[in-house]
């Protein structure tokens, strides 16, 4: 009996520790990109996946202690996929007591009608979903739209654009919609997918799989995701370093004339700080930038096992 109680305390301690890390990551992203401001009404897009559940949970947690006032409204788009368990999210949100809206639109039927069998449905599905969510945000008076993309999603997008699109373009933590009417934020931008997965498992969120893309295992994004996971296992710190690189761009050392005036470099031009490496090899640090040793969740401080709630 005592052993079972001890295991429960250790599991609770680890969950609290993980939640604190996710809170810290989300809080830093919100501060760095000014994602949430006084009086904001945040429309939290809830798909039924681990990422959006985690985003809603962490935002609700932060809402209780934030120095500013903001409100949340959870929105789920029921795309009328066959077998979609409509009751799952409804029951979860009712139990949670959060304001919510379920939007019903048969985008599944449109996608199946327009996209040939075996072809990727993601592009059309995303466009349809985006339009509906923008419209819903206007109806609800939302000032920000929160999406559940995390750090790994952002890196995957960068490599997808480099490998297949010939562009150095990622997924911004904050953006303005093309029509200039909506601000989209990604509060999980600094969060690791493996942390989100562990948190979702521990909280036992009622996960709902996407039937539209679940039958497309060879998507380009999945190939990139597998590559990044392999790198993370074989070369600890590489993922952190790559994400750090996205925040430390040096236009003078790339090849885009739109970002840096290479043609304007003449005798007497202003010196670019750190730019004189024409004849030298740049020194690379022994440890990857931004890397920290993985925390050993099993090495617990016995004196702190009575922690039961994150404040």
Swiss-Prot record:
GO cellular component: cytoplasm
A Pfam family this chain is assigned to: ATP_bind_3
Entry cofactors: Mg(2+); [4Fe-4S] cluster
Record flagged with keyword tRNA-binding: yes
Cofactor descriptive note: Binds 1 [4Fe-4S] cluster per subunit. The cluster is chelated by three Cys residues, the fourth Fe has a free coordination site that may bind a sulfur atom transferred from the persulfide of IscS.
Disulfide bonds, paired cysteine numbers: none
InterPro entries named in the record: Rossmann-like_a/b/a_fold, TilS/TtcA_N, tRNA_Cyd_32_2_STrfase, tRNA_thiolation_TtcA_Ctu1
Keywords noted in UniProt: 4Fe-4S, ATP-binding, Cytoplasm, Iron, Iron-sulfur, Magnesium, Metal-binding, Nucleotide-binding, RNA-binding, Transferase, tRNA processing, tRNA-binding
GO biological process, one term: tRNA thio-modification
Compartments, as annotated in UniProt: Cytoplasm
GO MF term (any one): tRNA binding
Catalytic activity: cytidine(32) in tRNA + S-sulfanyl-L-cysteinyl-[cysteine desulfurase] + AH2 + ATP = 2-thiocytidine(32) in tRNA + L-cysteinyl-[cysteine desulfurase] + A + AMP + diphosphate + H(+)
Associated pathway: tRNA modification
Short motif (PP-loop motif): ranges: 47-52
Protein's UniProt keywords contain Iron-sulfur: yes
Binding site for [4Fe-4S] cluster: 122, 125, 213
UniProt EC number: 2.8.1.-
Miscellaneous comment as given in the Swiss-Prot or TrEMBL entry: The thiolation reaction likely consists of two steps: a first activation step by ATP to form an adenylated intermediate of the target base of tRNA, and a second nucleophilic substitution step of the sulfur (S) atom supplied by the hydrosulfide attached to the Fe-S cluster.
HAMAP family per UniProt: TtcA
Family assignment from sequence similarity: Belongs to the TtcA family.
Subunit structure: Homodimer.
Function per UniProt: Catalyzes the ATP-dependent 2-thiolation of cytidine in position 32 of tRNA, to form 2-thiocytidine (s(2)C32). The sulfur atoms are provided by the cysteine/cysteine desulfurase (IscS) system.
Protein name (record): tRNA-cytidine(32) 2-sulfurtransferase
Taxon lineage: Bacteria, Pseudomonadati, Pseudomonadota, Gammaproteobacteria, Enterobacterales
């Amino acid at each position: 009996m005592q052993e079972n109680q001890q295991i429960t305390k250790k599991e609770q301690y680890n969950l609290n520790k993980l939640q604190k890390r996710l809170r810290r990551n989300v809080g830093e992203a919100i501060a760095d990109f000014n994602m949430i401001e006084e009086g904001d009404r945040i429309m939290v897009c809830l798909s039924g996946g681990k990422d959006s559940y985690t985003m809603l949970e962490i935002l609700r947690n932060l809402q209780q202690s934030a120095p500013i006032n903001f409100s949340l409204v959870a929105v789920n788009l029921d795309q009328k996929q066959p077998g979609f368990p409509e009751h799952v999210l409804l029951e979860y949100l009712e139990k949670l007591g959060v304001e919510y809206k379920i939007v019903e639109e048969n985008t599944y039927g449109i996608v199946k009608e327009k996209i040939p069998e075996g072809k990727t449905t993601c592009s059309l599905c995303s466009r349809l979903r985006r339009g509906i969510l923008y419209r819903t945000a206007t109806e609800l008076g939302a000032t920000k739209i929160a999406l559940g993309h995390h750090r790994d999603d952002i890196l995957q997008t960068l490599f997808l654009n480099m490998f297949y699109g010939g562009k150095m373009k990622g997924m911004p933590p904050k953006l303005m919609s093309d029509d200039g009417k909506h601000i989209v934020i990604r509060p999980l931008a600094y969060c690791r997918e493996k942390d989100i997965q562990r948190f979702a498992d521990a909280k036992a969120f009622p996960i709902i799989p996407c039937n539209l893309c679940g039958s497309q295992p060879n998507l380009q994004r999945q190939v990139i995701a597998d590559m990044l996971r392999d790198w993370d296992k074989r070369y600890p710190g590489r993922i952190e370093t790559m994400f750090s690189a996205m925040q430390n761009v040096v236009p003078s050392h790339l090849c885009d004339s739109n970002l840096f005036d290479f043609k304007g470099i003449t005798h007497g031009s202003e010196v670019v700080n750190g730019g004189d490496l024409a004849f030298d090899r740049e020194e690379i640090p022994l440890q990857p930038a931004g890397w920290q040793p993985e925390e050993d969740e099993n090495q617990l401080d016995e004196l702190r096992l009575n922690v039961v709630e994150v404040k």
